[in-house]
Amino acid sequence: MELFSANYEENTRALDDLLGVGRCFDMISRDLYVGGRRARMWVVDGYGDDAVIERMLSFWLPLRDVSDAQTMQQFIDRYITFNEVNAEKSVKNTVTSVFLGKMALLVEGYDECALIDAKQYPARGVEEPSSGKVLRGAHDGFIETLVANAALLRRRIRDPQLTLEGHKVSDCSRADVVLCYLENKVDRKLLDEVRQKLAKIDVRSVSMSQESIAEAMMGKQQWWTPFPKVRYTERPDAATACVMEGDIVVLVDNSPAAMILPTHFFDFVQEANDFYFPPLIGTYLRILRIVVFLLTMFITPVWFLLVKDPARTQAGLEFLAIDSDYSVPLLVQLLLAEFIVDLLKLASLNTPDVFSNSFSMLGALVLGDFAVQAHWLVPEVLAYMAFVAIANFAQPSYELGYAFKLLRLMLLLLVGALDWIGLVLGCIVIVVLLAATKPIVGKGYLYPLCPLDKKALLALLVRKPISRDNT
């Protein structure tokens, strides 16, 4: 059955069967009389706003006659006082809408169903996200409810040019996806490209929210590159700034993060804290972040290259040499330290909050001391790996941090096998990977360096003062 008919019993049987009435404990179905006519309503328990539903029932039940409404649309106009309601002819669309949280109402004598958007999803408060914290500025954050996230953006951009364009993705989850952009700022060609990629997504479910959508939009052609193709933020102020700059912010229901398109490599230099400090300090923080990017990737491979040959540390670089004896090969020590850092990260993620801080500190101290006492690691290896671990948290993207880790491991292995030639070869591989990586949409991944846009590159490296043209 694709469309509702004038047969009330047939319509109710079809909806009962498709919605799982009797099979699903949380599917509520109630019979009632409205104006002397039989009627039935369906709603998922936990989705419906009880106060709204109660008010509507208290209005419908006393009705004596609704014969003046010849169609469901006329019934809606005269007897449903709620704002968000529409008549639906399709059975499939009705079922999907109920699973999305709407209440369905069938009334005898009509060949359409009323869909009332009286949903109220379970939601947490808009507290500040655990990542991307700022010293000053707003301390709210996105949550798992799409409507609330859209309201956080609307509250900051009170402009009629702001468009929140709704889409549905996947066959099974039917996830709500919203594109947020400014009509007078967005690149229309880029916007059309995003729409086309969303329309072509052919997956049953996007249970992992943005990551599932990002992978579906990218396809399989870029699986070999470790660099992230999208930026994520849980901060409404950061998402607002991107929209104001002409970017597209993608919100997905059930996700507390916003996806920012287009994304280029140098976009990761920026962070929300830059704009809560004066321009000079913001510029310093960006330059510091770039230096940290380079050190994170190269400090351990370069140090390993220098200490492999004692002669290289005699020309004013004696402080880099290893004083203590060691039995485990230095390359194995560095790799072991890398894996221990990841082990501590994974363990802290799965540790209850009450114990996580103390566990991280004690775990690092105990493991580090044990490794030195057992002659597994020399103190210099621990010192450099501690710097790398701290530096990873100085940049705002977890994905980029793990990309640097994989490239750092590659450099260590190449240096161990080929000495300085391995370092040069590894640098060439990194440059080729960066040049070959393609963003989901937009210009090249290395924009604004390649293709060169001096003005855009300067804006990324230097935090300019706020002005009318630079907001």
Residue positions per predicted region:
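Short polybasic/polar patches that bind polyanions
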Residues: 158, 199, 345, 372, ...
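Membrane-embedded alpha-helical signal segments
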Residues: 1-302, 306, 310-313, 319, ...
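Hydrophobic alpha-helical transmembrane segments of membrane transport and translocation systems
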Residues: 379-381, 385-471
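Transmembrane alpha-helical segments that form the functional core of multipass membrane systems
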Residues: 249-250, 257, 263-411
